[in-house]
Amino acid sequence: MKIYFKTFGCRTNIYDSEVMKNSLKNHEICDDETKADVIVVNSCTVTNGADSDVRNYINKANKNGKKVFLTGCGAISRGKELFDNGKVFGVFGSSKKENITEIIEKNIKFIDLGDINKSQNSIVKNFKKYTKAFVKIQEGCDFNCSYCIIPSVRGHARSKDESIILKEVLNLANNGFSEIVLTGTNIGSYGKDTRTSLSKLLKKLSQINGIKRIRLGSLEPSQIDDEFKELLNEKWLEKHLHIALQHTSETMLKIMRRRNKAFKDIELFNELASKGYALGTDFIVGHPGESDKIWLEALNNFKNFPLTHLHAFVYSPRDNTHSATLKIDVDGKTAKERLKTLQDIVEQNNFEFRKKHYNELNVLVEQKNGDFFTGFDEYYNKIYIKSDKDLTHNWIKVKKYEIEKRGNFTNF
């Protein structure tokens, strides 16, 4: 049979889809969903909107006569509903992904969610269509923020065995991958359950021959400890960190049941910026409790953060979370205006950062889009490159370039 894998959501899901592709036997992986016999939907459920996207995709696949299997976070939150409504042939949990061949060969409809707290030690040897490799180092989260459903669908925080991670990255390096991205539900919690730490793991990964750059997924402010700070001058560590704030009002952080404190966060971000780091964050606009007064407090604080990258979005209630039981204080129009305000601030910050840090850039070229090759530098800024050579998958040093609002531009 021809199998198509449709992946929604985060880097963790990208990794899990690659595990399934690497585990599939006796069937053909298809890159064209219209020609597939079977579609495996690796779903995201972080918002109600994400659920809708998955549901709409499945409805379309059904209309086209495809046999559909559902996995990922949505299998836990919406799997039974979709199964009972006859939308999917089978539903299986993330812990079952290595059994993908057996699963798609089933002739009887089924639900098998497995154990969401199972330790998973999968190894991916190759990432087709990617210039960098994603490496999942842990699963689950113990933070239980008021707006988030992920702990209930990904389980408690548990670390992947260090020896398996090292073996996996060695295999990837031997297969030509020189940049890795560490991913997971909450990667900063790595090692808490195994008497080690993310910093210790990073030191060992950096010693693997062939690895030039290590990028990190999202960290929490409390996870940037002294041990981690000792690594900040290492050349192999990406000069960009994504640290989840979610908000910059002390009151809102309490309502959200967050562990971070706004004024401590400002101190941390300024310390990291002084080391030359580009800094990104997440921000939820319009969460219940965000009054005009609280918004102004948050905005004033936000302006004091040296942010260069931003993943911000307007709050939408997520079923089965505490926040969904609270009254929304902000209308949609106002929330979008607040979102635009934050985006404009960070866009200008990023522009000024690139002008201030006009250095030689190390770029891994990922692909060609139109007239330009594109890739990302160590600050996680996109660069557009004109060249007569095929630069795809190559590292290049960029010494001269033009800085524009939308990115950096060069000829090579």
Residue spans for each PLM region:
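Proteins enriched for Cys/Gly/acidic motifs involved in redox and nucleic-acid/cofactor modification
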Residues: M1-S189, D226-E227, L241, A262-N270, ...
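Active-site proximal loops enriched in glycine and acidic residues that flank catalytic Cys/His/Asp
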Residues: T7, G184, S218, L245-H247, ...
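Conserved SAM/AdoMet-binding glycine-rich loop
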Residues: V68-G72, S77-R78, L82, N174-D292
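Short acidic, glycine/proline-rich loop/turn micro-motifs
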Residues: L253-M256, H322-L326
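Short, acidic/polar
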Residues: K293-L299
